[in-house]
Amino acid sequence: MDSSAVTVKGLSLIDFCSTSSFKYRGHHELSESCSLNKKEEEPMLTCEHPETPSLGSPNSAVSPSQIMKSVSLRKEKDKSPELCETPKLRRKKCTLRRRLDFSFPLLKGDSDSQSRSLESNISQGVSLEKHLPGSTSGFPKEDNFSPLVTSTIKTEDVVSNSQNSRLHFSQHKTSTIEDSKDNCGLFEVECLSPIEGNDFKDSITHFSDSSLSVSDENTCPELLGSCGSQTTYGADVTTSVTPVSSLIAKIKFNGNQTLDSSGEVRDSLFTPEDSGFCSLSWDKSEDFLSDQEGSFQELLQKHRVTPKVGDQVKKPKHFGRLRRLSTLQEQGQSEDEMQTVHPNSDSGVLESLQGSEEKRGNLALSFKDLSNTPALQLVQELFMKSKRKRSQQEDDQEFFEDRDEGKIARLQRVLAGLIGKKMGIEQLDILTELQYRNLKHILAMVLESLTSESLYSAWNVSRNWREIVAQDKKANRRRKLYIIQLRASAQGAAVLRVQDAATRLCLLSRLALRSVQAQAQAPSGEQVPTLSPWGDVLTPVASSSLTHLRSKQEQYVKVARTLFTDEALKPCPRCQSPAKYQPHKKRGLCSRLACGFDFCVLCLCAYHGSEDCRRGSAKARGSKDVLPGSAQSKRNLKRL
């Protein structure tokens, strides 16, 4: 037996290659549509799917003429098929998706498993077809099925036919509930995505179901890798001829068992990195995550849980929107990636295997894959808001620490209207705070209550208070008047002390007796009562009898107690009472208040100041004058 072929037309091959898309009704149709063509030299098994089934008749009968036609077309085609554009089917309505939970465990046996007898498998297939009912009612999950067909075709043909199988697989789209309701076209320009080939780069990108995902745990990688197909189409008829290579030899139908997604199975995946299968797998994962409507943590937990059969039956609520989003993302990624991998080159296969492994390991659940999910957009927005708050807090901390004038001024403007910001401070400048708040009427009331001396003192406190007093015209006028009074009083005090100052400046010893001299000084300008030489207040009668009451010596002793160090006593030329005179000025003054003669010591005349004395009269008068205590004065006393 040289070779064996299996012809699967249209949608049945997609249901055959996809694990999670197998359902009970699909399996019944597959069993019913299988026809056996047995020859003596070259046995052949042909399986055909009904030609574009309508909604009313999903399972139409297959005539022998169609079987012969498919076989003849298979022989006429070359072994190296060419890639062609995806045909646009004209059917408007599609039946519900038929899935069957089958897994395709790999058989690692030797060539003995590939050389099984075709007759036994055919008999098993015939018996299986008899037992299956024609209705589409429920099919039990627990039944186990043995391989329908095995073939001994050489493994070299797998490499050439695998890419054609994937192309054929990607060009078909299974029906959904939404398509049946909306009566929408299945194949449109918007649903095409680039898949690299010989003549074109456009094909279906998004299949909107977990059955087309390479990363699904129920998908058999070798089945997807070993499928091959050729498509010939006309106006209304599409014919698919698929050779059965190691596909049947390595696949065993088991409805009760699921294939574990181990590293060994993933390594056997024969798909380049830029093929349609990788895009399907990642699109499926994105759709699965974008369907979630819960929180982000629930989304992560649901993504990590192994998908069950019941979960796969559920369809996305918004299938059309998700399909368009995935298609746009697929086109954007294909435009960015300009590198192409030849499907028949070994090096390209190895690089694609490594790239797909890295993609599954790193991009299994990343933010890039979840860019279409509303939950991730919400999480990213919250993260950016928290980041802005942290940066704002850091900026505020730097703002308080920085001593730049601009930033400090900005802070002062912000805190200017804060009430109670000065609480707890021991010393507070109330006038400055009132001026800062432009409360001039309150400042006017405060300054009006102050005295002129207080205003003068406030002027000298600080520059701010000086500005405050200067702004109030009334208070500033009072301050100026007080300054004028101070100056006038200072000049008057200086005039009063001019007479004593002339003598005091000559002697350094007067500094020690200044307090005593102040007591002897009598203020001028006021009416001083008549005093005796001893300081008693005298009436005019008492003053006339003064000479009679006291002796002249007692008078001299009384006046001598009030003399300064630079003064001396001398009798008055008129009344002979004790008179004080200053030797350096040559001027004398009678101590008796009734006389009070101011005279010149040289000429004994009225004091003439800087003018020259009259010498004659002075000498004559001088000859008569006798110094007290002299011999002449003693003789005069004796004579008296």
UniProtKB/Swiss-Prot annotation:
Positions annotated to bind Zn(2+) 2: 600, 603, 608, 613
Region of interest called Disordered, as start-end residue ranges on this chain: 328-354, 615-640
Zinc-finger listed as a keyword: yes
Protein purpose: Required to establish and maintain the arrest of oocytes at the second meiotic metaphase until fertilization. Acts by inhibiting the anaphase-promoting complex/cyclosome (APC/C) ubiquitin ligase. Probably recognizes and binds to some phosphorylated proteins and promotes their ubiquitination and degradation. Plays a vital role in modulating the ubiquitilation of CCNB1 and CDK1 during gametogenesis.
Domain F-box residue range list: 423-480
ZnF bounds (ZBR-type): 568-616
Gene Ontology annotations of biological process type: meiotic nuclear division; negative regulation of cell cycle process; negative regulation of meiotic nuclear division; negative regulation of protein catabolic process; protein catabolic process; protein ubiquitination; regulation of meiotic nuclear division; regulation of mitotic nuclear division
UniProt subunit comment: Part of a SCF (SKP1-cullin-F-box) protein ligase complex. Interaction with SKP1 does not occur. Interacts with ANAPC2; the interaction is direct, ANAPC4, CDC16, CDC23; the interaction is direct, ANAPC10; the interaction is direct and CDC26, during spermatogenesis. Interacts with CDC20.
GO CC term (a single one): female germ cell nucleus
Keywords recorded for this protein, A-Z: Meiosis, Metal-binding, Phosphoprotein, Ubl conjugation, Ubl conjugation pathway, Zinc, Zinc-finger
Modified residues (Phosphothreonine): 176
Pathway: Protein modification; protein ubiquitination
Protein known as: F-box only protein 43
UniProt PTM comment: Phosphorylated on Thr-176 and Ser-275 in response to calcium, which is a prerequisite for ubiquitination and proteasomal degradation. Ubiquitinated in response to calcium, which promotes proteasomal degradation.
Origin: domain of life: Eukaryota
Gene from which this protein is expressed: Fbxo43
Residue numbers binding Zn(2+) 1: 572, 575, 590, 595
GO molecular function term, any single one: zinc ion binding
